[in-house]
Amino acid sequence: RAGVVLQVGFNRRFAEAWATAAAAVHNGAIGTVQRLSSLTRDPGPFTADPARIAPATIFNETLIHDFDTLNWLNAGSEPVEVYAVADALIRPDARSSGFRDSAVVTIRYDNGAIATAEASFCAMYGYDLRGEVLGSAGMVQMGEPTSSGARLFTAAGKSVTTAGTDTSRYHPA
């Protein structure tokens, strides 16, 4: 009615490597999904004041993208178990306020697949965004610290593409 487009900001769905990987998973190129992983590490050094950051920020603003990615890649399945551990490893002095800067989450889906999501607020080597889906017939990997390409591994071999680094992977999106 307002004539504007409204969209939730889950930008990985529009990044080329992630869309390519999702297509491979969804068209059955890697078979039945067994394991998924998604990793987000923000570039360091971490300079924000932990007192100004809500305690659950690592979950609500960082890992939320990993959760969306895992659910998108494992389309049609629902999480049935979730376990999380988080701590203030970068800023242990902020631990008592509830601030968490590092977290790992394990998810079991109703189709039997198991997923992990990992986040950190401080990767001194730069922005690091990666993912992987292991299936009964192959594997697809997305991103790495020096590349944003998708890599597909099957019995037929592997395919590798490389692209820009840092946030340039989202420029076309």
List each language-model region with its residue ranges.
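Rossmann-like dinucleotide-binding domain that binds NAD(P)(H)
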Residues: F46-I114, S120-Y125
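C-terminal glycine/acidic-rich active-site capping loop/insertion
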Residues: N11, R95, Y109, L129-A173
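Alpha/beta-hydrolase-fold catalytic nucleophile elbow
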Residues: L39, V85, L134
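A general structural signal for well-ordered alpha-helical segments in protein cores
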Residues: A17-W18, D66-F67, A173
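A contiguous active-site-proximal alpha/beta segment in oxidoreductase catalytic domains
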Residues: R1-A48, A56
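Structural detector of well-ordered beta-strand residues that form the stable sheet scaffold
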Residues: V5-Q7, S37, Y83, T116, ...
